[in-house]
Amino acid sequence: MVLADLGNQLSSALRSLNETTIVNEDTINQLLKEVGNALSKSDVSMSLIIQMRKNIKDKIKLDQMAAGLNKRKIIKQVVFDELIRLLDPGVPLWKPTKGKSNIVMFVGLQGAGKTTSVTKLAYFYKKKGFSTAIVCADTFRAGAFDQVRHNAAKAKIHYYGSETEKDPVVVARTGVDIFKKDGTEIIIVDTSGRHKQDSELFEEMKQIETAVKPDNCIFVMDSSIGQAAYEQATAFRSSVKVGSIIITKMDGNSMGGGAISAVAATNTPIIFIGTGEHLTDLELFDPSTFVSKLLGYGDMKGMLEKIKEVIPEDSTSLKEIAQGKFTLRSMQQQFQQIMQLGPIDKLVQMIPGMNQLPQLQGNEGGLKLKAYINILDSLSEKELDGKKPITQKRIITIAQGSGRHPNEVVELLEQHKTFEKLIGKGGPGGGLGSLMAGKGGPKNMEQAMKQMNANGGMQGLMNSLKGMGGMGDLAKMFGGGGGGGGGMPSMGDLAKMMGGMGGGGRGGGGMPNMGDLAKMMGGMGGGAGKGGQNGFPNLDLD
């Protein structure tokens, strides 16, 4: 993601505070200069940068700070809060109501990714348990209905359109009426786009808006226009009641920061950002989370929510892992669940400190996991459960049945042995296996770390992950078993961090399970004074 460059520059500016022996006005001015330059390169409006600098200066009064206060930490927290404020219009997001028809109308210029975003949004809410449908009211662009039909079929979403009716208002009204009668909960109307803003486009939007009476009108814009997003968003808002904005193509240009800050200045909330071409490449936009990931603090709350979506707490494989067992069937189930979490490179971005990680090559890790799953699918039931050994002859047969090379089968079996050894050493209810299952406490974390250090530490684990593809850079990131490289915490630091995250889960009062951990993460932010904002944890920003 090109925005990573902005994140690295901002992180570098904040880290420079640690290198100064004395914190004074000159230190603050230099910090604000570096932050301002980084934002300017991302096409953030100079007027917004000047205002942000003023806000920071007004909040940091060095001569009024009590002796003994950590000035560096306070300054970093103020900068963090003001970056959030820069991107947050302070307007609540629209949320659909379960059990009733919610009509959503999409508007935007041609080429902004509007039709693709329509399908992504329908798919997003479908995964949340809503019944969804798409109405193609774009009768202007040739091939628009074909695109909707193709996308909707791929996402398994109901759709409506017409190859003969040329009046977009009639198509929109008819489609909405059909799905309302069916009780569809989210009906998304895709409207025509243009290559430029013109009176004909705006008049058509007004007519469709009057006909379908949307609960939310979403304006889709391309992030590459940078701060010009302000004028574009303002123009559309003057014609229809735009309630939310989706900013697309955030994965491919350096103007995203400018676009987001410009839109926030219009007091219109950004509801999603598009980060790729896949159906799942649509992320809920939260200013606090966005800045957190940008600065390398990660999004553990979001990561836990993703995990909870695909891994039930009563999973048989998790129960076996908690008992120190890790069969090939366990591995198969874990791989399948990892695939459901989305591209590995995007998952890695949610882990604190990973903004320093070189970008993984596409979805290389995902492709390797798919290959492994194909191999595991070719195993017999007894082989999966560890009740029958896999001979050299069977390796050849498995390779032929899965369409893979025998070396890949051997590689997979070696990966399994590594993880089986790590998980099994803790025994029932202890060590790494119990932690993976979401159980155990700080002592368990310590035990798990000892297990891992005995097997080469984090480096040993990462070496075993290299075979999955796309994980080589991740292995480099962690350095040796005793200490983290590239600014990442060492194994000891990681154990302390996890041990101090809060005790008491269920049972023996140790590490909370997945459900409790998600609740705990959700409650880490808030508060006044030095506390985080908008649910962001009170991180030690030193």
Curated annotation (Swiss-Prot):
Gene Ontology MF terms in the entry: 7S RNA binding; ATP hydrolysis activity; endoplasmic reticulum signal peptide binding; GTP binding; GTPase activity
Family listed: Belongs to the GTP-binding SRP family. SRP54 subfamily.
Start and end residues of each stretch annotated as M-domain: 296-542
Domain notes: The NG domain, also named G domain, is a special guanosine triphosphatase (GTPase) domain, which binds GTP and forms a guanosine 5'-triphosphate (GTP)-dependent complex with a homologous NG domain in the SRP receptor subunit srpra. The two NG domains undergo cooperative rearrangements upon their assembly, which culminate in the reciprocal activation of the GTPase activity of one another. SRP receptor compaction upon binding with cargo-loaded SRP and GTPase rearrangement drive SRP-mediated cotranslational protein translocation into the ER. The M domain binds the 7SL RNA in presence of srp19 and binds the signal sequence of presecretory proteins.
GO biological process terms held by the UniProt record: SRP-dependent cotranslational protein targeting to membrane, translocation
Reactions catalysed, as given in the entry: GTP + H2O = GDP + phosphate + H(+)
EC number(s) reported in the record: 3.6.5.4
Binding site for GTP: 108-115, 190-194, 248-251
Gene: srp54
A Pfam family recorded for this sequence: SRP54_N
Record-given protein name: Signal recognition particle subunit SRP54
Entry keywords, A to Z: Cytoplasm, Endoplasmic reticulum, GTP-binding, Hydrolase, Nucleotide-binding, Ribonucleoprotein, RNA-binding, Signal recognition particle
HAMAP family: SRP54
Assembly: Component of a signal recognition particle (SRP) complex that consists of a 7SL RNA molecule of 300 nucleotides and six protein subunits: srp72, srp68, srp54, srp19, srp14 and srp9.
Cross-referenced SMART domains: AAA (SM00382), SRP54 (SM00962), SRP54_N (SM00963)
Native source organism of the sequence: Dictyostelium discoideum
GO cellular component: cytosol; endoplasmic reticulum; phagocytic vesicle; signal recognition particle, endoplasmic reticulum targeting
Location(s), subcellular: Cytoplasm; Endoplasmic reticulum
Functional note: Component of the signal recognition particle (SRP) complex, a ribonucleoprotein complex that mediates the cotranslational targeting of secretory and membrane proteins to the endoplasmic reticulum (ER). As part of the SRP complex, associates with the SRP receptor (SR) component srpra to target secretory proteins to the endoplasmic reticulum membrane. Binds to the signal sequence of presecretory proteins when they emerge from the ribosomes. Displays basal GTPase activity, and stimulates reciprocal GTPase activation of the SR subunit SRPRA.
Region feature (G-domain): 1-295
